[in-house]
Amino acid sequence: MAVLLLLLRALRRGPGPGPRPLWGPGPAWSPGFPARPGRGRPYMASRPPGDLAEAGGRALQSLQLRLLTPTFEGINGLLLKQHLVQNPVRLWQLLGGTFYFNTSRLKQKNKEKDKSKGKAPEEDEEERRRRERDDQMYRERLRTLLVIAVVMSLLNALSTSGGSISWNDFVHEMLAKGEVQRVQVVPESDVVEVYLHPGAVVFGRPRLALMYRMQVANIDKFEEKLRAAEDELNIEAKDRIPVSYKRTGFFGNALYSVGMTAVGLAILWYVFRLAGMTGREGGFSAFNQLKMARFTIVDGKMGKGVSFKDVAGMHEAKLEVREFVDYLKSPERFLQLGAKVPKGALLLGPPGCGKTLLAKAVATEAQVPFLAMAGPEFVEVIGGLGAARVRSLFKEARARAPCIVYIDEIDAVGKKRSTTMSGFSNTEEEQTLNQLLVEMDGMGTTDHVIVLASTNRADILDGALMRPGRLDRHVFIDLPTLQERREIFEQHLKSLKLTQSSTFYSQRLAELTPGFSGADIANICNEAALHAAREGHTSVHTLNFEYAVERVLAGTAKKSKILSKEEQKVVAFHESGHALVGWMLEHTEAVMKVSITPRTNAALGFAQMLPRDQHLFTKEQLFERMCMALGGRASEALSFNEVTSGAQDDLRKVTRIAYSMVKQFGMAPGIGPISFPEAQEGLMGIGRRPFSQGLQQMMDHEARLLVAKAYRHTEKVLQDNLDKLQALANALLEKEVINYEDIEALIGPPPHGPKKMIAPQRWIDAQREKQDLGEEETEETQQPPLGGEEPTWPK
């Protein structure tokens, strides 16, 4: 049934003689199915003539579209005739099923034609070619499967062997029941061939196989053993099983083995030729599929996707990549001046800053084919696949030129090639990189394929990849500035239902999140919306944004983690020490919030400072940062005369600042104005240092002096303000969370003047105006979060 269905759906008839198709015009060809007058087609007398003729006519007319080749027409006719004589109802079901599949495919083609309406002519032509390639591939697959199915069916039909049996099965299931007709002994193979009577019943079922093989240990005494078994079964002499011997020589066995091997190789060659393993275009073989580049095609002409106006911030980066778009749209402006557009651009920057987003915008704006592929998709465990995929990618790009090729995370294939010094190498990655270098700037390079790549690890890229002529333009996308963060916040806030306008929140949130990437900002906006929905608010409030910022910075409050009274007291004095030192010193940031609620990031409490967009730091500013970080440890020592492990992260920060001041910033008098790069660990954790062991000891000594000086200064600040430290700790134990206004009410204003806080004047004026006018917020516009009124920003 399956073979016949494949025959009907996959093959087409060519010219040449052959048996007449069974449904063609002519005389009736089978009993029980008289021919309908004037048509010569069979019909079933048990069904209504009108309905049957109409349905059968449609089915047979559809089947005529799938005409058979001369090679298999005779086989198909024989199968159909046998099937018809044995079970005509099943034949009708088969024809009806084939008609259903054919009409279903016709409907699917009509749907595809309807979908293609309204598309551009280029898109419709491209879609047509793609469908033709797919249809050709499917036809080749069906032909291959058909050949395999027919060969296996014929071999199975011609073979009468039922497999191997044991001596016990032979005696009890065949010999004792009288099913054995004769046996034939093959001495060279120690095999006995057992031939059964037609229609023999073996193991309780009728068997079509009439020959079984039996392995015998002592072939010379087989006949004697057989006669003894017949005597035990009381078989008469006239009914004894005849035994014959078949001897094959060495050359006969060799010829048989060579012939079977040749037949198998011929079948494999034929299958591989049909499948395209010989390199023919359009092949569907597994190896060809592995060699093909798995890129994503972005069509900017569809009008969908990300445009430059959707990318907030990154003004300089957008200006640089826009030149590629302008060149592809109107190259004559550049060519008439003799200018050459760069061959490629490398987008650099920290994670989450929008490198891939900018590439998506280029894909939409360029209005040319955009082939995107990730770097890790080039490398596989099979050698040579990476280079093959690079060739496949650029071959497709040159066919679609002008075109843009985008490789995301290019560091996966663009790492520096190994040298003889290292002793380690990855040949597959190096071959992939070499092929990429040749395709980007080699003998067959064209000027109409532009390469964009992105990575956040430019330091490990190979120098040949970074040189002019390949990735000759390096676009650095840094963390967004204050203005860029405000634009990014406004872009993400547009999709949220806010209590106020998006510009009402964007400025404060931008000032509250220095050092945040675009991905972090998107995460904050999403967390605020999720929190508002979880709390049942009808719009996103200020408290929701504060919760989102706090969650990103310190994690979610872990209320299930209950601290003992002693631990709560230690944490309260620890965080109060940080807050008090930061409050009393001049060059430290303002304390926004102090909490002793445990967090999911393993922190038992935190003091949230207001960070600043600052790129230059003086020695005094760095020193006071060290003092503020040591405030928790010093507060524990003064309050309890012992220290805990809670200051581990603080000590790590202090150590990093101290060594940076000594080794990189040249701020240690004993070392002088010299700078060394950060330590780079090599193989086995061993790094090469550009300074001597003696200088290392001097730098260690200077760093220890800085840390000791900062700790003494911190202790002095806390000792002079023990009452304020106690007041802050008691307030934390009572409320668990205090903010800027609470601290100012407890210990007074900062001694060096008010700290810089985020309080836009329009926010304060809006709050005062609402209080003066006595406005009442309705539930539809503003629902009080967490059962209370929405708090104002700290002043």
Swiss-Prot record:
ATP binds at residues 312, 352-357. Changing residue 284 to P: Might be implicated in the hereditary spastic paraplegia phenotype; requires 2 nucleotide substitutions. SMART domains: AAA. Zn(2+) binds at residues 574, 578, 650. The modification 3'-nitrotyrosine is found at residue 505. GO terms for biological process: anterograde axonal transport; mitochondrial outer membrane permeabilization involved in programmed cell death; mitochondrial protein processing; nervous system development; proteolysis; regulation of calcium import into the mitochondrion; regulation of mitochondrial membrane permeability. Residues 109-133 have a biased composition (Basic and acidic residues). Residues 44-105 form a propeptide. Residues 1-43 form a transit peptide. Residues 106-144, 270-795 are mitochondrial matrix. Residues 701-795 are annotated as: Interaction with PPIF. It is found in: Mitochondrion inner membrane. NCBIfam families: FtsH_fam. Catalytic component of the m-AAA protease, a protease that plays a key role in proteostasis of inner mitochondrial membrane proteins, and which is essential for axonal and neuron development. SPG7 possesses both ATPase and protease activities: the ATPase activity is required to unfold substrates, threading them into the internal proteolytic cavity for hydrolysis into small peptide fragments. Forms heterooligomers with AFG3L2; the m-AAA protease is composed of heterohexamers of AFG3L2 and SPG7. Component of the mitochondrial permeability transition pore complex (mPTPC), at least composed of SPG7, VDAC1 and PPIF. Interacts with MAIP1. This is Mitochondrial inner membrane m-AAA protease component paraplegin. It comes from Homo sapiens.
